[in-house]
Amino acid sequence: AVLPPAPADEADAVEVLRGPNIQPFPQSRPFADTLTAELVLKVGDNITTDHIMPAGAKILPYRSNIPKLSEFCFTVCDPTFPARAKAAGDGIIVGGSNYGQGSSREHAALVPMYLGIRCVVAKSFARIHAANLINAGILPLTFENPADYDALQPGARLRIDDIRTGMAAGKLTLTDTAAGKSYPVVCSLTERQQAILLAGGLLNYTKEHAL
């Protein structure tokens, strides 16, 4: 038998019982027109989703527990990353070529989002991972000049202005506020992807556009 949905007032009163390793799904925040964030991690070429979100028997039991999974994020590259990312509030990751290659696991985007990552700037992205970042509310940008990768160092305070206008134009500017230097970055997004990011991810976008 097909059961019709409960009326809204009854549905709101339904209590969802979760096991100890099932936590509520995290949601990103909508983008303001300016993002100021710390460069919390710089990685090289061919970073895989296994680097970002390791797999294996130790981690598998927590697949529905994003807060617990966050303790393992990028730890194969930098064991201090989870704590530093949470402390930074808003964070940016800089990567080399083919960032996010390998398994298409969504956790490699959802977990960094939970840790406060708002943007990844790379020389290039693996296509599926770039789409997952967008759905998680993380802005994927590519260097217009790949050599600019060398100039950015962890700990820098970075700013991106006029995000809405820049998304539509396909170009934004990344500014190192302490060094006073700016770097052009490319923003290759469809109109729908722009709307998803501005809403703070696919879940927020879907809620806004639900009938």
Regions found by a protein language model. Give the residues of each.
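Fe-S-dependent hydro-lyases/dehydratases of central metabolism
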Residues: A1-L211
